[in-house]
Amino acid sequence: MVEIPQAKIEVVAEFPKGYFLENLAVRPDGSILVSAMNKRELWCVPAPTQNLPVKPVLVHIFDLMVLNMVEDGEDVFYVTASDVYTTRESHLYRLDMRGWLAEKKIEPELILVFPEPKVGLNGSCLLAPGVLLAAGITALIWRVDLPNAAESARARVWLKHDNMLNRPGGKKPEQPGLNGLRFAARTGFLYYTSTSQNLMMRVPVNPNTLEPEDMPQFVAGGSLLG
């Protein structure tokens, strides 16, 4: 039998019982932003040292559930927040962490309230400078043109497909359809998972328009993707 070397796993930080940690983003200094979805909180875990675990620092409490953080420029993040269970209202915030200290209060800038259809949010990724893609928790991907000196942030539906739909009653607890997404800049494909359908798909992206260039393509599927 072939022996597979096991990775060493260490506890970096601990959160209280009942916290649902949804996502993370590593800052340039090695510290880690962590979203506690069910508490509407964003935390910063100091860069790990030899003395583990380290103590997390609360960064901000949002009005909605905190879901995802994407870095656009060094230490500048776009944070998505949603009411995923009732109103499906969704917001996008700009969070400038440059020069931030643990004892310093920080106020995220609300740059966008997502328009209809209100679907809630889940994963998000940077497609190119100035363009963010955010996954609706039902069956669509938003394109967000980020703000610049001349224009405010704008959102529109980038892609919608049946393989992104959730299947009510298919799994307990209920699982989303479209979930995570990542853009592979080297190959020009956007990859996404559809949790309730046990699918991993990809879409070719036009390098000039940053729009979908063809229909979604099957990558993998099965119970392990649930």
Predicted regions and their residues:
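A short helix->beta-strand "capping" segment at the edge of beta-propeller domains
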Residues: 1-19
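Beta-propeller fold detector
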Residues: 10-13, 53-61, 103-113, 152-163, ...
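Beta-rich, blade/repeat-based domains predominating
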Residues: 14-29, 61-86, 114-132, 138, ...
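Short loop/turn segments immediately following the C-termini of beta-strands
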Residues: 37, 81-84, 136-138, 146, ...
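Structural motif
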Residues: 41-44, 87-93, 140-144, 199-204
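Hydrophobic alpha-helical segments and helix pairs
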Residues: 100-159
